[in-house]
């Protein structure tokens, strides 16, 4: 909860167990954004502004971690919005200071930042959601940086500086996000991915190729992704694989690799 710690509901009995300052005096804060049951008799807790805690369910002892600007191996931010345990047993945290990987042996953190070899690959410093998809890739939702994708196989063998990321950014075409601020990631039973954004609605990414690909009409002459006329009367391809489309009033539109490369019209003397 936001103000009163953690509530555990036993579905069989309908009773709650409370984890707060009264029952766990060493708990760093009762303000909580997220909780993960690690399956190892520990609760992993992300606080609103008080860092990260690990609560032992055996004896209710805690380990508390805060950001230290003088320690590069400390938690990168004190606001922890999301925690994930991946299929390798790694604990990932999304904070207001970036993406972090917890090292249980050294009780320290590895922070993932921009790859020094990729000037366009910038990781946001504010992470809202982390999900492991069925293809063994980590999807990271962030503020103003869209989706960052990390292949978990990479992270087992490379240092953070060497790891490369994939990115889904905001844009105007059908292959881009409607908004750069992504708050939630969900993969359904059909392997489709749903993204909840802040201001851009829901983005849907199908696991299967579309049944139809359409070439739409646009009144903008410079739009090379579209037809210049709504009425199509004939279609054929040439030996180079280009698509020739005859229209009623727009002449002949020629497409190559899904882009319009030429228009032949009577008015211009080309037909």
Language-model-derived ranges and their functions:
Residues 1-271:
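Carboxylate-rich, polar loop motifs that coordinate divalent cations or form catalytic acidic clusters
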């Amino acid at each position: 909860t936001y103000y009163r710690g953690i509530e555990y509901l036993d579905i069989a009995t309908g009773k709650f167990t409370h984890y707060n300052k009264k029952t766990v005096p060493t708990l760093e804060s009762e303000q909580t954004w997220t909780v993960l049951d690690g399956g190892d008799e520990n609760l992993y807790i992300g606080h609103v502004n008080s860092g990260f805690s690990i609560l032992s369910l055996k004896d209710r002892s805690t380990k508390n971690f805060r950001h230290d600007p003088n320690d590069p191996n400390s938690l990168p931010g004190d606001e922890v919005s999301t925690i994930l345990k991946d299929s390798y047993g790694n604990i990932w945290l999304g904070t207001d200071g970036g993406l972090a990987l917890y090292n249980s042996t050294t009780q320290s953190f590895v922070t993932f930042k921009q790859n020094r070899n990729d000037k366009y690959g910038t990781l946001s410093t504010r992470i809202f959601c982390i999900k492991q998809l069925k293809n063994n890739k980590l999807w990271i939702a962030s503020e103003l940086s869209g989706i960052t994708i990390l292949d978990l196989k990479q992270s087992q063998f490379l240092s953070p500086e060497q790891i490369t990321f994939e990115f889904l950014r905001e844009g105007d075409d059908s292959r881009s996000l409607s908004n750069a601020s992504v708050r939630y990631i969900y993969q359904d039973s059909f392997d489709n991915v749903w993204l909840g954004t802040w201001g851009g609605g829901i983005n849907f990414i199908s696991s299967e190729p579309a049944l139809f690909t359409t070439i739409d009409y646009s009144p903008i002459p410079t739009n090379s992704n579209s037809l210049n006329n709504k009425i199509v009367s004939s279609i054929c391809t040439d030996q180079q694989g280009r698509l020739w489309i005859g229209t009623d009033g727009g002449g002949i539109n020629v497409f190559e690799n899904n882009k319009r490369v030429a228009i032949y019209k009577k008015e211009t003397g080309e037909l």
